[in-house]
């Protein structure tokens, strides 16, 4: 075979593969996602009754009010920033990631003692691991059921709700292990707090 014929065959093969891999396959996956999993494919957004986006079940938010179940600490403040002073362009690019400090690192210990422990103790909360340590991405939307239950007394007092009602709410909003064996049970903080707002004081 001549060089020209071999080169032509290689070019045609590359073009066909490019069309399949860069055009057909991506559009096929987009179509499948929009038809079969439209909610997940569009970011698992949570909206209120007016259609206003409140957040995503996949990305955590910095809940810190005593009226709500608090989120895990985040080294990136859940990729939020002041729109008027966003020097790091967080709102344009988004950031994630933990501090990568070892459990014995003095800087981490100081942060936990000075910030998280003081805040939790002031609120009368027994600290759990996920209430003082960040997740690997610093964007985790979940806390453990134990971390949620540790906050029941504070929220019950502030909202004048019976603790047992909050315990039931936590149980109702706890995600079990995937397929019953993978991962650990978790509570999505955004969904839990939205359900909390629907409760009425007794």
From Swiss-Prot:
Organism phylogeny: Bacteria, Bacillati, Cyanobacteriota, Cyanophyceae, Nostocales
Name of this chain's protein: Potassium-transporting ATPase KdpC subunit 1
Keyword terms, alphabetized: ATP-binding, Cell inner membrane, Cell membrane, Ion transport, Membrane, Nucleotide-binding, Potassium, Potassium transport, Transmembrane, Transmembrane helix, Transport
Subunit structure: The system is composed of three essential subunits: KdpA, KdpB and KdpC.
Pfam family, one: KdpC
Superkingdom of source: Bacteria
TM spans (from-to): 17-37
Organism: Nostoc sp. (strain PCC 7120 / SAG 25.82 / UTEX 2576)
InterPro entries from the UniProt entry: KdpC
GO terms for MF: ATP binding; P-type potassium transmembrane transporter activity
């Amino acid at each position: 075979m001549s060089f020209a014929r071999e080169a032509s065959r290689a070019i045609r093969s590359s073009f066909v593969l490019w069309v399949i891999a860069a055009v057909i396959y991506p559009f096929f996956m987009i179509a499948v996602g929009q038809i079969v999993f439209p909610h997940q494919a569009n970011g698992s957004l949570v909206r209120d009754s007016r259609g206003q986006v409140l957040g995503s079940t996949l990305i955590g938010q910095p809940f810190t009010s005593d009226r709500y179940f608090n989120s895990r600490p985040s080294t990136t403040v859940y990729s939020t920033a002041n729109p008027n002073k966003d020097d790091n362009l967080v709102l344009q690019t988004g950031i994630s990631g933990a501090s990568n400090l070892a459990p014995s690192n003095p800087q981490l210990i100081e942060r936990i003692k000075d910030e998280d422990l003081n805040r939790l103790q002031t609120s009368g909360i027994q600290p759990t691991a996920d209430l003082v340590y960040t997740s690997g991405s610093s964007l985790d939307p979940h806390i453990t059921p134990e971390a949620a239950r540790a906050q029941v007394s504070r929220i019950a007092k502030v909202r004048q709700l019976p603790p047992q009602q909050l315990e039931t709410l936590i149980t109702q909003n706890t995600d079990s292990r995937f397929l019953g064996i993978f991962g650990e049970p978790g509570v999505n903080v955004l969904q839990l707090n939205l359900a909390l707002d629907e409760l009425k004081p007794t």
